[in-house]
């Protein structure tokens, strides 16, 4: 094994051991390592589960979105579809997006956080509900029958609060 691979293996195993010791779960599952780094940067508590909230902030459970793209944004994909729009709106408001008081959006550049923005859950809902409503009636006929929509850079800059 060459030196670079040996160093990588050591760092990988070390990261995993740190996360295991703290009850943070697998740092290499989905964007978990980014969530752990965001929580540490924001002085939030890392969520102990991979389902539901990503972290706990001063207001309770929080949602994190991150990107490695050139511009910040937040994708809300893979949302379960309910039978009616009324049920869907209730689900989004009470069980999914609106459940979290604060949503945090981060853009990573290389291995570092380039920027973090905070947005209230009700603002995120006001942005996403019209986008999701447009897709609702036809989503079940799609190849992937789940809802998804994004909060754009412009929306984050206009309605969010810059943290970093």
Task: Show the residue positions of the predicted features.
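Nucleic-acid endonuclease domains
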Residues: 1-164
